[in-house]
């Protein structure tokens, strides 16, 4: 294992290199671009033996991923924002075709107005596509999650694609120490992809054929069952990863939740700030905890209910908006926790900074609520 001070984008590229995909179709887009650049260099320098395809668009990138995966090889790609939106048609196809693709998404706001800065609207818009979704907090977690995603996606009981989501600029361009495991250890944890079904000219078959009402619903139900099965596969993979590499992950992560009266729920890099503020609030006598939702799909319903069982109030921070009802995570958690007070807070859209003062405001508004959903950090003239 080697310790390097690198960005989360480089951490993702290092993880992809360690996973040894055979095909990498990618189209660069800010703030994902350096992922594609690192991978291109790895291939050009002979460090990674893969077919690096310089496609003309993100739609083509995902189409090439589907074709390569259907032919039975491990594939990787990366995108962001408008690129993911352009992929939308094929994102759904990849899940329906049961292609175990792994894709990194550098979370960035969607136009309009045009923004290159961070929020999570792009990946949230794909939450119903049939892809597993992991939201990471650090460069280390980004690297580890790419490796874990291959292990889970390629399991014969799952065979669904995975999206590793990392906050644009906040993570993608920030450097920090990251442990890079040895190729030998990764090969032991992640063996070569063994496809169950693949396109083979010697044994012709069809993949992704037209279907009618007699079969379509059952096909979608198979995706649902695979998503449900993935929970235990994720937990098992995380246990084995911890035994080999010493870092623990799960569907969710609890921080000072056991005796918390108020629990803040969030995804991604903001969780680091939340921990710092929670420690300060604890010093002031406020019983506040954090529930980090690491895996958004499959949705960790039982883990969320268990984590908040002792809390009287729950505050959900969303870096996205489902217009007229609040953030996506808030709508799901409020539906899940009908027996307690759940409040939603829209934060950080388009890269708006989320400060410790904003988090303290969220706690105050949860203690003395005025409405179910509140936008935090707006300019005064907009309120």
From Swiss-Prot:
Keywords: Oxidoreductase. InterPro entries: PFOR_II (IPR033412), Pyruvate:ferred/Flavod_OxRd (IPR050722), Pyruvate_synthase_PorA (IPR053390), Pyrv_Fd/Flavodoxin_OxRdtase_N (IPR002880), THDP-binding (IPR029061), Transketo_C/PFOR_II (IPR009014). Its EC number is 1.2.7.1. GO terms for molecular function: pyruvate synthase activity. One of its GO terms (biological process) is response to oxidative stress. It comes from the Archaea. This is Pyruvate synthase subunit PorA. The gene is porA.
């Amino acid at each position: 294992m080697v310790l390097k001070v690198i960005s989360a984008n480089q951490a993702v590229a290092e993880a992809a290199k360690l996973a040894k995909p055979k095909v990498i179709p990618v189209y660069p887009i800010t703030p994902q671009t350096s992922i594609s650049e690192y991978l291109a260099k790895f291939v050009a320098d002979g460090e990674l033996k893969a077919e690096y395809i310089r496609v003309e668009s993100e739609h083509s990138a995902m189409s090439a991923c589907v074709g390569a995966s259907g032919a039975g090889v491990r594939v990787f790609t990366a995108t962001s924002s408008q690129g993911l939106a352009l992929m939308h048609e094929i994102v759904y196809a990849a899940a329906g075709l049961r292609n175990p693709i792994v894709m990194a998404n550098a979370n960035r706001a969607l136009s309009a107005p045009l923004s290159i800065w961070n929020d999570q609207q792009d990946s949230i818009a794909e939450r119903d596509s049939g892809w597993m979704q992991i939201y990471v907090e650090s460069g280390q977690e980004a690297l580890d999650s790419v490796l874990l995603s291959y292990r889970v996606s390629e399991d014969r009981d799952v065979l669904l694609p995975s999206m590793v989501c990392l906050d644009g600029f906040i993570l993608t361009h920030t450097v920090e120490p990251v442990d890079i495991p040895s190729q030998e250890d990764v090969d032991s944890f992640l063996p070569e992809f063994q496809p169950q079904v693949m396109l083979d000219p010697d044994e012709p078959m069809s993949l992704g054929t037209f279907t009618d009402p007699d079969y379509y619903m059952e096909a979608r139900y198979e995706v649902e069952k695979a998503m449900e099965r993935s929970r235990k596969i994720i937990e098992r993979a995380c246990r084995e990863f911890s035994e080999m590499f010493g870092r623990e992950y799960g569907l969710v992560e609890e921080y000072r939740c056991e005796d918390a009266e108020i629990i803040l729920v969030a995804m991604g890099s903001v969780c680091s700030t939340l921990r710092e503020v929670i420690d300060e609030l604890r010093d002031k006598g406020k019983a506040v905890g954090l529930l980090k939702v690491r895996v958004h799909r499959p949705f960790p319903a039982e883990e969320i209910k268990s984590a908040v069982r002792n809390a009287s109030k729950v505050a959900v921070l969303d870096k996205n908006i489902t217009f007229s009802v609040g953030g996506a995570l808030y709508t799901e958690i409020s539906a899940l926790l009908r027996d307690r007070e759940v409040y939603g807070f829209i934060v950080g859209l388009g890269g708006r900074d989320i400060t410790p003062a904003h988090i303290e405001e969220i706690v105050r508004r949860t203690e003395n609520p005025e409405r179910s959903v509140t936008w935090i950090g707006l300019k005064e003239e907009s309120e």
